[in-house]
């Protein structure tokens, strides 16, 4: 059965129409939306992570608070920018949060997306070595993160304090968390690397490459390549694959007021540039639920993935986003199974 989750960008700004005017609004409403989503029957509550922006930057306190208010819904990120992370400390935070949640974390990590800061991770003390790219830095931090989660010895013990010279692992450890780490992949090449590293695949609403084929088909190629490489990599467990889509069903006058006149260009794939590289962006799915179902059934990547993350307009508030999720769960989800 395909899992459905929401993905919140956590925007907050004191502008007309925004119900998340402060960072506190965005944080508390993220918690409330996770509670509402669980009551509706949505499978996952995921948040984006961005630094130096009016968005969510520190995921672990938020995820822990969401965990304390819920019982069954998966809780995750899409994605944590590993350029900014100390891999070992991130592993400690992730394990503690996962224990609080009862093993419900699904953490997406990656190199991160284009940002407002120029080389922002360097201000956190993480500077690429000579000849190293920021993508290399993110992968290096991720390797430490995975080692920590796997329970490897990290630091030599002080024999005077411990009576041993063994390497000490990080604590706490949370069983099974290592298999619930996802890599946010924007190309077919990084999908291959993700499979080799033994991480689940998280594919977003864009790919940083374009071959001229529709976005869903290109993303489906990425998913199949990931699964093909996984099958030969020797892992003894089955990975998961998620894709993200903007889905805005119109069933009420309020829906129509918000999205009825959405620009036509957002209802089709777009091609542009990110970080001086060509990229293909997926379209928004807007309209009557039956129309959206028909379009999603024709989206090869949506049908290939086992998890669909729906991006939500978080600044419209908890009640409205709960309404959107309820419509998706009731009128769209059954047809996708």
Regions inferred by a protein language model and the residue ranges of each:
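C-terminal helical cap(s) of enzyme catalytic domains, especially alpha/beta-barrels
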Residues: 124-130, 142-146, 215-226, 317-337
